[in-house]
């Protein structure tokens, strides 16, 4: 996790989930997402990147069974009054990227990402 001074209370979460479907071995869903999240922090450190906001890596469990891990994280985050500017997850395997999606209220995008 990187905690910085300019906006330390604004969290950008990157993550993946450790569990997989019972018939799968988990390399693509979502072992590759776990590696993507951890490698992002490693690269940020290697190039001495200094983010303006806190960057937190979270590896969830029990996502394939109703997203219980991320719901537990959200409950704890809400109880601690944390503000997450964005949450980024890679969950489509380690193949060539097919695109980038964003979910949320589009009216808040300029407010959240305009800084």
Name every feature range the model reports, one short phrase each:
Residues 9, 22, 60-115:
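Metal-dependent peptidase/peptidase-like ectodomains
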Residues 1-7:
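Short beta-strand-to-loop junctions in surface cap/lid or active-site-entrance loops
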Residues 4, 15-18, 91-92:
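Short, small-residue-rich loop/turn micro-motifs
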Residues 3, 40-47, 76, 80:
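Structured segments of extracytoplasmic/periplasmic soluble domains
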